């Protein structure tokens, strides 16, 4: 319940009874202070009047006063300027590292707040705060959605910056890894990222004019050129159709030339995947995109519009895959271009965060601004998360809105972080 005490203090949701210290002195909270989520006191620079005297300093909050000693704050000089120790239960006197007794105050959580909080944690329906959504003002909704959208973009930017570091500062390589991850479309995202780190782009660049060799390296590094990766019923046809053997021979030569080691093919997931999302198809599309030389980082960041970005990423498969989904398994001829739906998702999850991260890296606001513009222009995702929020009455106009709601579910609802959510704040005030 300590986090709930933090929440009550931060938002001044105090009980109707007057606040007072354990010695009976009246307390008036002028400013609860700045919430600190790192090491040190819980709230910085709070302003409280105690018995008519204004105190400015830090506030520490605990379930029980004795937690002060459990956390060894009595040995830590950073807590010497705590002007008020707020506790759910004051079960002992507390002293700082100088041996000085702290001013302490017992804070009760209002019954209404406690009731609403327990409801939020126990409701099985998603979102648990669905009852409050229709009554929220548009200002409250838009402010929180904008904050969530920025938070999600920052999160993706941090992931890209981590890839840049892993790629020794090579932004082109980090962009390729990011694009590859998003070609996994969720289910195979991690496998595609691992695969991309196994692709030596400098080596592949020497063979960029030969689509067969590009696809051989791409498929080989995915671990998909071993016979045992093909379902047994298709192995004979794969050996007879010639293409599998041709790729395997090319890869054998190139693997020796560049000292390549493939990833473990068992990382790929096929169960309940639509054939269009099979790794073979997505890898062939990436090979074709790389061969076309039109989807490099420079082309992407200079895309002036969403349509330009989609043209950069538009790709198909090599001819063999127009009639196959795996080696040896024939299908009706299909050009297997990236669908408009897939291009929309790639723009949301690759183009936008790359633009934002690259703009921040270069200190060029035009790229960051374009990232937000693209989010407003792109269609929203259509998945169960978005549909549930729409059923609650939220309007989802664009990809910025859908990204905000995905962030809300993953980082707040799923983690029961209602106390950090503005919708949760409104619910607790009911």
Predicted regions span which residues?
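Short loop/turn segments at secondary-structure transitions that flank enzyme active sites
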Residues: 65-67, 90-92, 111-113, 185, ...
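N-terminal ordered "arm"
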Residues: 7-66, 79
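N-terminal "leader" segments that precede or initiate the main folded domain
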Residues: 1-7
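Hydrophobic, aromatic-lined core segments that form the binding pocket/scaffold
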Residues: 149-404, 417
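Short Cys/His-based metal-binding microdomains
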Residues: 63-66, 75-82, 88-90
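Catalytic micro-motifs at enzyme active sites that drive phosphoryl/nucleotidyl and oxygen chemistry
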Residues: 32-37, 45-50, 68-75, 90-96, ...
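Cysteine-cluster motifs in flexible loop/terminal segments that predominantly coordinate metals
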Residues: 403-430
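Compact, glycine/acidic-enriched structural inserts
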Residues: 82, 86-144
């Amino acid at each position: 319940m300590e986090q709930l005490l933090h929440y009550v203090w931060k938002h001044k949701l105090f009980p109707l009874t007057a606040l007072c210290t354990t010695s009976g002195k009246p307390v008036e909270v002028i400013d609860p202070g700045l919430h600190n989520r790192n090491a040190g006191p819980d709230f910085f620079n709070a302003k409280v009047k105690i018995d008519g005297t204004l105190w400015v300093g830090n506030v520490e909050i605990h379930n029980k006063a004795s937690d002060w000693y459990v956390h060894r704050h009595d040995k830590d000089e950073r807590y010497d300027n705590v002007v008020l120790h707020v506790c759910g239960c004051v079960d002992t006197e507390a002293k700082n590292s100088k041996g000085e007794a702290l001013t302490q105050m017992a804070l009760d959580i209002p019954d209404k707040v406690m009731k609403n909080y327990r409801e939020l944690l126990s409701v099985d329906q998603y979102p648990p705060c669905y009852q409050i959504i229709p009554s929220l003002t548009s200002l409250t909704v838009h402010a929180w959605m904008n904050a969530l959208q920025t938070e999600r973009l920052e999160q993706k930017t941090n992931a890209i910056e981590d890839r840049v570091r892993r790629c020794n500062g090579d932004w082109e390589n980090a962009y390729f890894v990011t694009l590859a991850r998003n070609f996994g479309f969720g289910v195979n995202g991690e496998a595609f990222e691992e695969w991309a780190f196994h692709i030596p782009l400098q080596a592949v660049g020497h063979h960029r004019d030969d689509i067969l060799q590009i696809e051989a390296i791409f498929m080989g590094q995915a671990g998909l050129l071993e016979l045992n990766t093909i379902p047994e019923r298709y192995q004979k046809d794969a050996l007879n159709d010639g293409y599998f053997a041709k790729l395997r021979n090319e890869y054998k030569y190139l693997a020796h030339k560049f000292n390549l080691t493939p990833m473990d093919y068992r990382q790929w997931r096929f169960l309940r995947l639509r054939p269009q999302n099979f790794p073979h198809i997505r890898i062939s599309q990436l090979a074709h995109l790389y061969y076309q030389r039109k989807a490099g980082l420079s082309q992407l960041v200079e895309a002036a519009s969403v349509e330009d970005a989609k043209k950069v990423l538009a790709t198909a498969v090599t001819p063999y895959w127009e009639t196959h989904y795996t080696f040896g398994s024939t299908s009706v001829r299909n050009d297997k271009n990236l669908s408009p739906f897939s291009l929309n998702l790639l723009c949301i999850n690759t183009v936008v965060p790359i633009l934002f991260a690259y703009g921040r890296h270069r200190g060029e606001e035009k790229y960051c601004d374009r990232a937000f513009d693209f989010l407003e222009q792109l269609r929203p995702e259509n998945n169960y998360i978005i549909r549930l929020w729409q059923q609650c009455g939220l309007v989802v106009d664009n990809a910025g809105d859908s990204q905000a709601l995905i962030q809300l579910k993953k980082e707040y609802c799923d983690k029961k972080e209602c106390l950090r959510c503005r919708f949760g704040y409104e619910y607790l005030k009911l």
